Amino acid sequence: MKILGINASPRGSKSQTLRLVKTVLNGARSRDCEEEFVDLCKLNIEYCEACGVCYKSGKCRKKDDFQSLYRRMLSADGLVMGSPTYFRLVSAQMKTLFDRMADAVHCQLLTGKYTVNVATSGGLHNDREVTKYLNGIMLTFGSYVTGSTGTSVALGSGAMDAVEKKAFRLGKKLAEDIRVRRVYLRQERIHKENSAYFRQLVEMNKDEWIHEYDFWSRQKR
């Protein structure tokens, strides 16, 4: 079982978000998972230009670090997504990554994967808005969400210590979810609704979105 952790904080080794992402990975490793860590802000990932090439070919025309990271995300069994809170949302680096993954949404390419989402904030409880956003995004990609956690760093070291304990437990739970292929029924209903919707959307645009239409044509109804 392989789990990929992505930290979207630009603060390097000083990042509290990095600390949480690695704690989740440590929890997963304690359950015999192979883990990999990516510092997103060290990569060169350009903005999406809505050109639609990925809909037609399944590949992005930009020659940057996105394709390599995307392949690693698709090959992982589980993901740990971490972001600081910037004005009640994820960091620009995380949002840019998501914007480049439109093909993954249309084709529900994270189906069968499991995710833990973590966030930190300077404002009181704003991390909850970010974890809620991350949970929704990963569901939309087709992933199950094992859980999420976060904290306001201004609450002090005690709050961070407490959330680290939860993050470690979530890492263990993530490994177990992958191992037993756990089905979350409410999330599964959302996945089925999204799959039906995006299949219909792609079929409506089949003459333009050639790659995505070919993908859905191979999937069972």
Question: What kind of feature is each model-predicted range?
Answer:
Residues 1-83, 88-103, 165-221:
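N-terminal beta1-alpha1-beta2 submodule of the flavodoxin-like/Rossmannoid cofactor-binding fold
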Residues 10-12, 86-87, 120-125, 152-157:
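Short histidine/acidic/glycine/proline-rich micro-motifs that form metal-
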Residues 48, 128, 158-159:
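Short, well-ordered secondary-structure micro-motifs
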Residues 66-69, 112-116, 133, 152, ...:
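Residue-level signal for alpha-helical context at structural boundaries
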Residues 92, 106, 110-151:
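Short, glycine-/small-residue-rich phosphate/pyrophosphate-handling segment
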Residues 135-189:
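Active-site/pore-lining binding-face segments in mid-to-C-terminal subdomains
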